[in-house]
Amino acid sequence: MNISLFLAFTTAILLGSGAIRPLEKPEVFRYPEKTSTANGKISYINNIAVLEVKGTPEQMGEAIGKLAVKAAPKAAKYPRDVLNHFGVEFLWIFFAKAGQRMTAFFPQAYLDELNAISKFSGVSKEELVVGNTLFDLKKIVACSGIAIEPSQSTTRGMLMGRNLDYPSLGYMNQYTLVTVYKPEKKKAFAAIGFPGLIGSLSGMNQDGLCLAIHEVIDIKPGLRKFNYDGVPYAMCYRQILEECATVEEAFELLKKLPRTSTTNLLIADRKRSAVFEVTPDQVLERKSKEGVVVCCNHFCSAEIKPFFPINVRRSFQRFSILEELRIPDSKISMASVMEYLDTVNLGNDTLQTMVFEPATLKLHLSYESTPSSKGPFNTLELAPLFQK
């Protein structure tokens, strides 16, 4: 099947299918506590599941496989469940074949990690590959984010908040996992995600560089929307956390990486913030205005913005609401950021809400119920976890 037609077909179905199945009754899941391997351990800190791993890709993959993925078999079935939820489970074989083709462009370290996860968890490589490429091959992530720079923050430090909006199916939020990676010869970083996810949808590193991905559906006619010969976007953004300390460094690295699809990346360091508007062929920086930058699910830059953009799950309205926090001569509190993220929540599909404080390396995370923006928020001190 032609990849462009396949992507258009699946996107149309997943955004507007009338075959959406009822959500499961919410459940409570907890990872086995205080378990460890030679290169990893899992524990709960302030009611947040934290997996710490270190070493080579194979060693980290072994720890992830044994401690997290093996302990959460239902989470490994999520890609199949989400297709079933939308009534398109028959497309699994297409996603599996497309994902397998994309593995040729995985960074070798990430492929080694994935293979080790499969070996030590018992989850098939096919399921892990689909779980790590489905984001690029379809578009159903609809997120909202905002960064408040130190000049506008009551904390006098950067605040970056985001809602991760993705079908929870009544259970996936319960599998939220903060994985603290301490790879050899790279920066330590925390990825807020799920077991078996190699890349980073949301994260912060030891230097306080933090980021959050927001998918974009459409692009100006004539521009390329998908690149089969690219690195899945979540893996690109993990590379940024492993190698970069500032927004400027991240911009330069991202321009060099082969990119698969269209995304907005909300990014901040301790001094400034921006949104990178990303396509397979371009990376454009949208700078903050008056100390604030907002990010949703559409492009704003004239070079790539469609003439008639799709208003994905009220992306325009969510954007406008968050823009209200750009208040000259006023300081914005963390409580206000959380309040506005709650205002733009997408109900049961808002499965993680978080605020990063780069200056203090703190993460404030809510995930226990949906919409997660309602709280409660628990705080995780990342600085001691980053120590090697």
Model-derived regions: residue spans:
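Surface-exposed patches in mature extracellular/periplasmic domains of secreted proteins
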Residues: 102, 125-133, 265
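Charged, often glycine-rich, active-site loop that binds/positions anionic groups
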Residues: 136-148
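Bacterial N-terminal signal peptides
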Residues: 7-14
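Bacterial N-terminal signal peptides that target proteins for export
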Residues: 1-6
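Acidic helix-start/capping segments at beta-turn-to-alpha-helix junctions
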Residues: 91, 131-136
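C-terminal, well-structured catalytic/ligand-binding subdomain of enzymes
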Residues: 21-120, 150-388
